[in-house]
Each structure stands twice: as C-alpha cells, then as structure tokens.
C-alpha cells in the first residue's frame, strides 16, 4: 500500500493537542471520486483553528487540516476529471472534517473540484486561495450593483488575506480605497497595495457618529465585524 506524509493534529488527552508529520497509507483516506496528489496548499485562519483543536471547526481528531489544495488527479471515477488533470479544491468540508491539503494526498468528491485554468500556475492558485476567492466574490457583488471605477470604497481587516486582496483588486479596478487596520506598522504595506488612505481602527470607530453618520462610502468589504461593521454601516451612502 502506497504511503505518504501528512500534517496531523492529535488529541492526546481532553482538550490537549499535539501535531506532527506522520506517515499515512492511502487506505487511511476516505473512499471518494478523486485521488489527488497535492502540489500546494495555503494557510487560512480556519486551518489554524483546526490545527490547534477547535472543535467548532473539526469535530474528531486525529485530523489533517488544509481547506485549500491544488494537485494532479491520480485516480478518478468521473470522466470530467481525467487522470493527470490539474485540479483545485477549496472549501466544502476539506480540512474541516475531511482530511485536508496539509498532506501529500487527498481523496474528495468530484463536486468539490474544478479544473485549474491553464493561465494560472498551481502555486499562484494557492497564493490566491480561499481568501482570494472570497475577495473576488465580494468585488463581484459590488460590480453587480455599480461600476467600481471612481467609487469610494472602505475595507476593514485590511491586512488579512481577504482584506489585503480586496484592497489590491479594488484599487486596480479604479476605486478610491480606504483601508482600516489595527496594525500601526502596516500602513505603508496597505498604501503599496493601492490604498489611498489608511485609518487606524480605533480612530475610525471614534470618528463615526451613530446611529446615522455622514454618508462617505459607496461600497464596503468588511472582514472584522462587530463595532467596525456597525460603524461602516452608519457611514455608507444610502
């Protein structure tokens, strides 16, 4: 039986978790449509939760995290995914309760996979990952309502994966982007991504009048939630 290596989190006693690289057999994977040899994965916040024993994300351990993966199909039960095709898997249950991308192999339903576009390298697909997919869907939702060129847009949680990609894409599409962050040493990083203005999170919260402030933003992408989201909602144009 073919062996492979995987990152595995194990519950050694109640609410105590260790992690290590382990040798696994293909028989350890769930039986499914596609057996994929993983080339790259990416690191998401949900992966960190799973890897450290958060049972709201992963119910049973031992477990291999990794909610994103790209790789080559080695076995297939679906003619739309021939052997040696390059595929991307993001989301669904991968890395949550199904062994994930922090492994040399995954086995998943074909409905979870998409053929990787030829113009996108495997490494680039995981650089984008779930964070980039989420940012892209947010921007598409804005585009469905209005043209992005010239609008005033605000992005919270701007140094994170979703936030930073949103800042870069909105700027590239011609929006005037304001980035909100709690990280004082990241202002130049956000300006380099294309933000015209960077506001400290606490300063932003103090500057907004509630319940209804002055309408400043044509669109917003919020990652932070809580008070930040409330303040954004108060200062949107309606």
Q: What are the functions of these language-model segments?
A:
Residues 87, 153, 216, 220:
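Receiver (REC) domain switch-region micro-motif
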Residues 46-51:
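Cytochrome P450 core scaffold surrounding the K-helix E-X-X-R motif
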Residues 147, 193, 197-238:
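Glycine-rich cofactor phosphate-binding loops and adjacent beta1-alpha1 units
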Residues 18, 90-157:
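NAD(P)H dinucleotide-binding glycine-rich loop of Rossmann-like/cofactor-binding domains
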Residues 25-43, 54-94:
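Glycine-rich beta-strand-centered segment in the early N-terminal region that forms part
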Residues 2-7, 34:
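Short structural boundary motif marking the start of a folded domain
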Residues 126-203:
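Mid-domain Rossmann-like dinucleotide-binding core that forms the NAD(H)/NADP(H) cofactor-binding site
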């Amino acid at each position: 039986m073919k062996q492979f290596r995987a990152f595995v989190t194990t519950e050694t006693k109640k609410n105590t978790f260790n992690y290590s690289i382990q040798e696994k057999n293909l028989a350890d994977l769930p039986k499914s449509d596609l057996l994929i040899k993983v080339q790259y994965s990416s690191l998401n916040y949900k992966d960190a939760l799973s890897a450290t024993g958060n049972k709201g994300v992963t119910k049973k351990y031992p477990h291999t995290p990794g909610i994103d993966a790209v790789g080559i199909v080695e076995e297939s039960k679906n003619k739309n995914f021939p052997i040696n095709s390059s595929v991307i898997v993001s989301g669904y249950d991968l890395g949550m309760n199904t062994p994930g991308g922090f492994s040399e192999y995954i086995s998943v339903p074909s409905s979870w996979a998409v053929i990787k576009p030829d113009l996108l390298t495997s490494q680039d697909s995981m650089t984008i990952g779930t964070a980039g997919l989420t940012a892209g869907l947010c921007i598409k939702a804005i585009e469905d309502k209005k043209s992005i060129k010239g609008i005033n847009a605000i992005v919270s949680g701007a140094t994170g994966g979703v936030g930073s990609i949103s800042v870069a894409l909105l700027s590239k599409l011609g929006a005037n982007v304001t980035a909100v962050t709690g990280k004082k040493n990241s202002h130049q990083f956000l300006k380099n991504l294309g933000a015209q203005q960077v506001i400290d999170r606490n300063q932003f919260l103090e500057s907004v009048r509630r319940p209804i402030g002055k309408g400043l933003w044509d669109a917003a992408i919020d990652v932070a939630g809580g008070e930040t989201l409330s303040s954004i909602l108060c200062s949107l144009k309606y």
